Regions:
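CE4/NodB-like, metal-dependent polysaccharide N-deacetylase domain
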Residues: 36-57, 74-78, 130
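Structured loop/turn residues at beta-strand edges in well-structured enzyme cores
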Residues: 15-18, 47-50, 79, 103, ...
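Helix-loop "lid/cap" segments that line or gate small-molecule binding pockets
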Residues: 9, 43, 188-190
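A short, structured active-site edge motif that brings together acidic residues
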Residues: 17-30, 51-60, 88, 112
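Short, small-residue-biased leader/transition segments that mark boundaries at the very start
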Residues: 1-3
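Short, acidic/polar
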Residues: 32-47, 92-95, 116-117
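Glycine-rich loop at the start of a catalytic domain that most often binds anionic cofactors/ligands
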Residues: 5-14
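Beta/alpha (TIM)-barrel catalytic core signal, keyed to glycine-rich beta->alpha loops juxtaposed to Asp/Glu
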Residues: 59-221
Length: 221
């Protein structure tokens, strides 16, 4: 779904706008202060909305991220974005950002799953009240056959995907599993009628083996 389709869906929905959370991103080729402001204006125009709920810097481009963040602060102060945040920022990038501003990101969107827990970044964000949002929370389905995950899923009468999502929620993470299949989308949302026990959570925590599907943010200086 493209940005125009997303905006049209929001505008035509019978759900009140205040109950729909709209997030969009500043892409790498639009970073920098002036470029970021112009990019946001384009995104808002394409969405056909008066504001977005969350605007994120997609990647910590080394020479431009500070200026990009200043632009996001301006966008928020103008009331065009309710919250601002980052994506793929390591704890090192965040520490550098903190030295230039008093306004902390509300969110850091990073790759997270039981098989990639990114402990240093996760601990840093929690200690600074930055909400973690995990993308690829299902590891693109490539670890569904893991024996520990499969056993816990069978014990809960749930799918491995549902267990992975529930694990993330119990860790305090937001999750954005990707699917275009209506049945799977429904299953991914059906995770609020069970809990994973402390023992099962510990077994899932032990699955962390740095199984990464996307570029490592620590590779960016």
């Amino acid at each position: 779904m493209c940005i125009r389709d997303s905006g049209e869906a929001v505008r035509e929905s019978t759900v009140p706008r205040a109950e729909i959370f709209v997030t969009t991103k500043l892409w790498d080729n639009d970073q920098g202060y002036d470029a970021a402001l112009k990019a946001f204006d384009r995104s808002l125009e394409e969405l056909g909305l008066d504001y977005v709920d969350l605007y994120l810097i997609h990647w910590p481009v080394q020479t431009l991220r500070t200026d990009s963040w200043r632009a996001l602060e301006r966008i928020k102060s103008d009331g065009m974005a309710r919250s601002i945040g980052v994506s793929n920022f390591s704890h090192i990038h965040l520490q550098a950002l903190f030295s230039t501003t008093d306004q902390r990101p509300a969110v850091n969107q990073i790759e997270l799953s039981p098989f990639l827990q990114q402990t240093p970044i996760s601990k840093f964000c929690r200690s600074h009240n930055i909400q973690l949002t995990g993308y690829c929370p299902l590891a693109k389905g490539q670890r569904f056959d893991d024996p520990t995950l499969s056993k816990i899923a069978a014990q809960k009468n749930k799918s491995p995907a549902q267990v992975m999502i529930r694990w993330a929620l119990q860790k305090g993470q937001a999750v954005i599993p990707k699917s275009s299949n209506p049945r799977r989308i429904g299953q991914n949302a059906d995770v609020f009628d069970f809990e994973i026990s402390p023992d099962q959570m510990a077994r899932l925590d032990a699955l962390d083996d740095d199984y990464r599907l996307c570029p490592d943010p620590l590779s960016m200086p």
